[in-house]
Amino acid sequence: MNKKKKPFLGMPAPLGYVPGLGRGATGFTTRSDIGPARDANDPVDDRHAPPGKRTVGDQMKKNQAADDDDEDLNDTNYDEFNGYAGSLFSSGPYEKDDEEADAIYAALDKRMDERRKERREQREKEEIEKYRMERPKIQQQFSDLKRKLAEVTEEEWLSIPEVGDARNKRQRNPRYEKLTPVPDSFFAKHLQTGENHTSVDPRQTQFGGLNTPYPGGLNTPYPGGMTPGLMTPGTGELDMRKIGQARNTLMDMRLSQVSDSVSGQTVVDPKGYLTDLNSMIPTHGGDINDIKKARLLLKSVRETNPHHPPAWIASARLEEVTGKLQVARNLIMKGTEMCPKSEDVWLEAARLQPGDTAKAVVAQAVRHLPQSVRIYIRAAELETDIRAKKRVLRKALEHVPNSVRLWKAAVELEEPEDARIMLSRAVECCPTSVELWLALARLETYENARKVLNKARENIPTDRHIWITAAKLEEANGNTQMVEKIIDRAITSLRANGVEINREQWIQDAEECDRAGSVATCQAVMRAVIGIGIEEEDRKHTWMEDADSCVAHNALECARAIYAYALQVFPSKKSVWLRAAYFEKNHGTRESLEALLQRAVAHCPKAEVLWLMGAKSKWLAGDVPAARSILALAFQANPNSEEIWLAAVKLESENNEYERARRLLAKARSSAPTARVFMKSVKLEWVLGNISAAQELCEEALRHYEDFPKLWMMKGQIEEQGELMEKAREAYNQGLKKCPHSTPLWLLLSRLEEKIGQLTRARAILEKSRLKNPKNPGLWLESVRLEYRAGLKNIANTLMAKALQECPNSGILWSEAVFLEARPQRKTKSVDALKKCEHDPHVLLAVAKLFWSERKITKAREWFHRTVKIDSDLGDAWAFFYKFELQHGTEEQQEEVRKRCENAEPRHGELWCAVSKDITNWQRKIGEILVLVAARIKNTF
């Protein structure tokens, strides 16, 4: 026995010995080493513990509180200024006075912070700007050099040598990873040696999508599936042909899953595959558990109250949305048994059942509910044959003869003659139905229709539509004198029967009459109700708004009636006559406009604009003598009117009656010597070539009106035309002394200096003009263009930046700034311009030109339309629009733009005025000027 005893047993362990360390074991502690777990309610070992400390939970709370009370109050957590990092009294209670003290200190801190906030922020901003100036970004340092890259030619670009690579060869030529397909011999070798084997995942079989290998959903494979007969590798060579066939078969299976077997088109989007899967889930809006809960809840409702129809309907619809249509049908049929008097249950049953079965269900419903209109309507809808529909509806009318809905449905299926007979019976059964009475009146003859409408008024004395239909009937048969009487009687009768006259409803009825062609009726309705319910001081404003509303709704006769009534009430109001005249000009005929203007000048003889509109209408129609006679009458009513004098002069000069024009101007200068009369006198002599007479008249005019800048401009331009540059400069300088705030004078003087080559002097003139006229966009724009024409693009860009700082909301500056940028930056600049000047026509025109330059034709056309809609007086916009249509539009589009421009009669625009005010074009029409301006435009932007 001693021989078998191990020699180390009973001996002390060597120093540092850890049992089990050699075989990898580690020390651990078990529950038996530390004792069983103790509940918080277990008593502690100390039986004499005071109350509050006798359980394990009380001891744990005490220890935790003791840990929380240990605050870090050593020197490392102390600061001389702030004290301890934590609060010395954090363990104390936070009372209301503590909260009040904290609020006071917070308010003091906030106040101290705001005292020098602006100064501090300004100082920080200046420091940042100074830092950026001293240390600019690399991009800013090379910005001027980058602009010069635009001047580099293509040959210079190609001649730039390639940048060398200073790295070593291995870094310069990295070895790319090469992927080589595994050869077939590799598979054959390992197949023969049996080192590897492959198997087909059961989830990839023809039952694709199942998580189990057998369609029955069992968790075990079918018998023999895991035996060596199937899952072990075979012996022999690999048959690559069979592998290829298997791969093709698998591909066909997958394609068949995502393809339409009928049309062959793919119906599953690979990118949205998961979304498509979600869409296949029934749209009940909940998961399976929610459906089960709802099903149980509805079952409980049905069992508790089996005669409650909504429970059966809800149960059937729940089964329907979950895809169990037959269960839904069974439920709803059971519901019809339990609730045979519920109309909704029968209709739901008819909806869920297929065609023939639905007819049987409806027939059964009719037996239980012979008075249900909805069931009869549903029965008619289920029939496909017209005769069957008629038969169903007639049967329904036998049971429910007072149903308007059934009568209407039945009448719609009949021929006119049968419908008339049926409606005669319908109005007897439903005498309070306005629609049936009106339908019968439409099918009857004139005499019978009058009788029908009279009966309708007797049965329904409170409906306005019967009266309006009667008025339309009389108008359609030529009795227009009866229309006014019928509408007046309608208002009286309705009021007598306690009906409140709703003005808005009657106006809508009048607009419907207008659209139907019943002009007399709509005008009579308007005259009858236009003044109802309006305060006397609000009448004019309200009526003008009503007229605008009618025009917007394309009810022109209603608007004409409103204007006619307003002119009767306000015959001496020039504004009403003017709006009516503009309405006739835009929507009426020339004859109606002239007739209105004749009445207008009779009531408002002092309204010059009305006289001028009448004369212009006659002149445009080619009736010059009539225009002269109108102006003669205008002279009698307004003997010293400047506008009428100038209109008469224009009429004579446009018709080549220059001597008449001279005599008229001479009379005007003697009787009404205004600055404009003198200006027109000078211009007439100038355009006729009488330069000396023009200069004499100009000198005479300046003696009377030296502060009228246009006279100084004309004097300088006449001298400039004669190549007398010194005299022209002197005229401009004298004019600027008298009119220092005239922008055109500054521009003319600057361009004169530029024309004779004095660029420095032109620049100085513009700088001086900007000092005397700060925040003037026109002067800034000319300064920018001056530098750009001189080739100093950098200075031009700098000036543009300053201009936009001084005039940040100037559309004309922003439009110029867009095209000062290089092409890639123009779009960004245009966005900035639109943010600053969203509704400025110059900015909109710049955006349209930008789209034009990018060949975005549709967008460009859209923005041109916006531009001319916002400001139709801007001739440049029309010229660019016309040029655009000449290049990209059809003849119809070009003609439309030209006609719209002629109707708008634009007067402003830089390019437009340069052509229209040229003395060689003084007799040209708007359309001719449009063509000339468009010809000058070169789309090099």
UniProtKB/Swiss-Prot annotation:
Protein keywords: mRNA processing, mRNA splicing, Nucleus, Phosphoprotein, Repeat, Spliceosome
GO BP field: mRNA splicing, via spliceosome; positive regulation of transcription by RNA polymerase II; RNA localization; spliceosomal tri-snRNP complex assembly
InterPro entries xref list: HAT (IPR003107), PRP1_N (IPR010491), Syf1-like (IPR045075), TPR-like_helical_dom_sf (IPR011990), TPR_rpt (IPR019734)
Acidic residues: compositionally biased ranges: 66-78
PTM entry text: Phosphorylated by PRP4K during spliceosome assembly.
Modified residues (Phosphothreonine): T180, T266, T275
Modified residues (Phosphoserine): S143, S279
Domain of life, source organism: Eukaryota
Annotated region (Disordered), positions in chain: 1-79
GO annotations of cellular component type: catalytic step 2 spliceosome; centrosome; ciliary basal body; cytosol; nuclear speck; nucleus; U2-type precatalytic spliceosome; U4/U6 x U5 tri-snRNP complex
Location of the protein in the cell: Nucleus, Nucleoplasm; Nucleus speckle
Biased composition (Basic and acidic residues): 39-65
MF terms (GO), sorted A to Z: identical protein binding; nuclear androgen receptor binding; protein-macromolecule adaptor activity; ribonucleoprotein complex binding; RNA binding; transcription coactivator activity
UniProt-listed SMART domains: HAT, TPR
HAT repeats: 384-416, 418-444, 445-476, 554-586, 588-620, 622-654, 689-721, 723-755, 855-887
Subunit structure: Identified in the spliceosome B complex. Identified in the spliceosome C complex. Associates with the U5 snRNP particle. Component of the U4/U6-U5 tri-snRNP complex composed of the U4, U6 and U5 snRNAs and at least PRPF3, PRPF4, PRPF6, PRPF8, PRPF31, SNRNP200, TXNL4A, SNRNP40, DDX23, CD2BP2, PPIH, SNU13, EFTUD2, SART1 and USP39, LSm proteins LSm2-8 and Sm proteins. Interacts with ARAF1. Interacts with AR and NR3C1, but not ESR1, independently of the presence of hormones. Interacts with USH1G.
Entry function: Involved in pre-mRNA splicing as component of the U4/U6-U5 tri-snRNP complex, one of the building blocks of the spliceosome. Enhances dihydrotestosterone-induced transactivation activity of AR, as well as dexamethasone-induced transactivation activity of NR3C1, but does not affect estrogen-induced transactivation.
UniProt protein name: Pre-mRNA-processing factor 6
